[in-house]
Amino acid sequence: MVDFPSRFDVIVIGGGHAGTEAALASARMGVKTLLLTHNVETLGHMSCNPAIGGIGKSHLVKEIDALGGAMALATDKSGIQFRVLNNRKGPAVRATRAQADRAIYKAVVREILENQPNLWIFQQSCDDLIVEQDQVKGVVTQMGLRFFAESVVLTTGTFLGGLIHIGLQNHSGGRAGDPPSIALAHRMRELPLRVGRLKTGTPPRIDGRSVDFSVMTEQPGDTPIPVMSFMGNAEMHPRQVSCWITHTNARTHEIIASNLDRSPMYSGVIEGVGPRYCPSIEDKIHRFADKESHQVFIEPEGLNTHELYPNGISTSLPFDVQLELVRSIRGMENAHIVRPGYAIEYDYFDPRDLKYSLETKVIGGLFFAGQINGTTGYEEAGAQGLLAGTNAALRAQGRDSWCPRRDEAYIGVLVDDLITLGTQEPYRMFTSRAEYRLILREDNADLRLTEKGRELGLIDDQRWAAFCAKRDGIEREEQRLKSTWVRPNTEQGQAIVDKFGTPLSHEYSLLNLLARPEIDYAGLIEATGGEAIDPQVAEQVEIRTKYAGYIDRQQDEIARLRASEDTRLPVDIDYTTISGLSKEIQGKLSQTRPQTLGQASRIPGVTPAAISLLLIHLKKRGAGRELEQSA
């Protein structure tokens, strides 16, 4: 064993989406951070589909961005197609999605990492953790080099005990072309943590020169081109390209159905549970047997490659079956497969063994982020990485941990779901998981989180100045609209009637008019001769005005719930002594050990009546302690 000559405050294991955000967050906060990766060339690598964002996911990306993270800016600099999903629905569920050039995205992330002060990168696999008296002290690499730190963040992705399946054949691997973490997986299984197996998969990659796009439906990006980062702009984007849509058919389904006995999932070879919302094509055919076809989105992997990602046909069937099913799809009759699809099984740890900070309950200073916690997706991983890296740095600084509440961020929803409910399948974020989604929009992530990020030390001066200018601009414009009045039978009044067909019965402020559903901000400014302002400011003014009543109602609901939500439950509370609680509920509470009353209320099977009994118990306990102190 050899000790590295320098000591670190935080060590991050893994250079994927969770690891990069964790390392960057920790370093931005001013603590000495080491990023340990098995291969420097794969930092920020997109292991699965070449896309960032989507329903629920873009909210996480914008929150990462609002806290100074890299994912959104890397997407703006590498995005080759941008679209806003649910554009005809309300702002709460609108979501930005971008196709990214894999090579550019990875290069941008690496550049950000290499230029981040307080961050050191070292290429070596981690084989062991140094743990003394239930506290992590450092790590040991493959060559026996020891690094010491106050906190360690594990972001191992699919590498822990990774097993790759193609047909009935399998081999060890972290992903295609990369070795797994076997020694570390064995070490982790020695810790007093609940462990399970999950699986995910990827489709075969296709050579675009062998595809007939003329029989497919073109899917261009949006115009004007959306932007992902609050600090981004459309000028950052590379050349934009289209995606294409085709479909499976009866012949495709017949090929798959007749070969299910050769599928590792349906022959019992794979034990891990796959993602419900990103099923393999075998799963789709089996679960939705009544459907005659399934969409396949043909996504370009980049501007300087012919490789295509056929989103929708993830598979682990044998190669000969993969080739046959691909060539049964319209437009891909002569397709050449560049890389076969595969499934991968890996270890994950029950997130109910974590605190809100993502620190493990049993090993002090050991944090988990990403797929190790049972999630799926780049965005979910990046969000956890940022939070874990932040809390690892806070711990090194001797400061209190932080996690946003469910009413403050989708990051808060994600973490609360994981540590309260756990997961038996890969967890994916959706807007439907958030009860306060009208407040947790992707467009206002900076207004919700950037001020807190500045307080934590995550936000640099440039981003802070831009945020303050936007926040002040919103306040100024709302005040201007509130104090500007329009009367009937005036030039401005008539302009509004002509523009919107809305007669004015009496004097209105521009803010009152903007609240009307038929009046939009751009048209109102055009009719009344106002000056053009920052589009981000204009968007916020319009949304806040039109949804003011609903937003106020949701804020009132949050205020009512927050009192009990934040009530702390003592660490040493013995649920078996609380009269009135059923044995089942006592067991659930004893196993989960919720930190707050709000968290306890979200445990499946814990009734409102049980929460009332807990509240009564806490009041009695508090009163009893006051009597003891007075005596």
UniProtKB/Swiss-Prot annotation:
Function: NAD-binding protein involved in the addition of a carboxymethylaminomethyl (cmnm) group at the wobble position (U34) of certain tRNAs, forming tRNA-cmnm(5)s(2)U34.
Primary site of residence: cytoplasm
Location in or out of the cell: Cytoplasm
Cofactor(s) essential for the protein: FAD
GO molecular function terms listed in the Swiss-Prot or TrEMBL record: flavin adenine dinucleotide binding
Gene Ontology cellular component annotations, sorted alphabetically: cytosol
Keywords: Cytoplasm, FAD, Flavoprotein, NAD, tRNA processing
Superkingdom in the source lineage: Bacteria
Protein name in UniProt: tRNA uridine 5-carboxymethylaminomethyl modification enzyme MnmG
Keyword Metal-binding: no
Ligand binding (FAD): G14, G15, G16, H17, A18, G19
Subunit structure: Homodimer. Heterotetramer of two MnmE and two MnmG subunits.
HAMAP family named among the record's database cross-references: MnmG_GidA (MF_00129)
NCBIfam families: mnmG_gidA (TIGR00136)
UniProt keyword tRNA processing present: yes
GO BP field: tRNA methylation; tRNA wobble uridine modification
Family listed: Belongs to the MnmG family.
Pfam families for the chain: GIDA (PF01134), GIDA_C_1st (PF21680), SAM_GIDA_C (PF13932)
Binding locations of NAD(+): 274-288
